[in-house]
């Protein structure tokens, strides 16, 4: 199945951008799906120097598109740009570590989740000052634009961290490396990807405290498309593809990775 996923993704890059994105009622009416993914999250989605997107999210999107009988191509997005990609017709789906929330469900229709990640904390290797979420009080914590991870700490857990803004999690990691921040906190898959890439420069605290349910976002109201995507996600777990992809991209991180079908949100508001 890995060969199928890779070949679908490769073929998609030669097929252009898929034409009119806003004219169809549902993604099921399209011959080709344009999928927005991140471009700077190691293990999840990066764009190589040759312009090729690769990573877990990319492979998930390619698998889903293949199950729907669609060609697929990819465009880059940032956390703050995800809703706009769908609203403006620049993408048909968003697969970009997009945590499902009540507020976001008012703007997009979520299929999935395709993975339930646990929020954790990334620090510089050897730094023992942060062992759990409570230790973030008074610490400099990076806040990536468009992410709700820091809100879960400051508002949900009422921990008075000192937030330092950055545009992306890649920038957050740069700030962590330089010492401008003391921690980065978000879903463990995001943190694991950076930890593997940096080869020992950073460490995951391994004190998870909040679940992050990563959904596949569709244009608001596409219930039929959402239901079909959920069937594809179920197939991905039941045929072993999800387990293989998780091991492929994150096996070296040491994280305990779930290979069970996540409980879906439901496609209607």
Predicted region positions:
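Acidic, polar ligand-binding/catalytic clefts
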Residues: 62, 71-135
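Extended ligand-binding regions for polar small-molecule ligands
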Residues: 18, 58-67, 127, 134, ...
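Short helix-initiation/N-cap motifs at beta->coil->alpha
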Residues: 74-84, 128-129, 164-178, 212
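Bilobed "Venus flytrap"/periplasmic-binding protein-like clamshell domains
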Residues: 34-42, 51-67, 98-99, 118-171, ...
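Extracytoplasmic small-molecule ligand-binding "clamshell" domains
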Residues: 19-97
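A ligand-binding cleft/hinge motif common to bilobed small-molecule-binding domains
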Residues: 81-84, 97-106, 154, 177-178, ...
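Periplasmic-binding protein-like
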Residues: 39, 115-123, 192, 196-234, ...
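Ligand-binding clefts/hinges and TM-proximal coupling segments of bilobed small-molecule sensing domains
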Residues: 19-22, 148-164, 203-204, 234-269
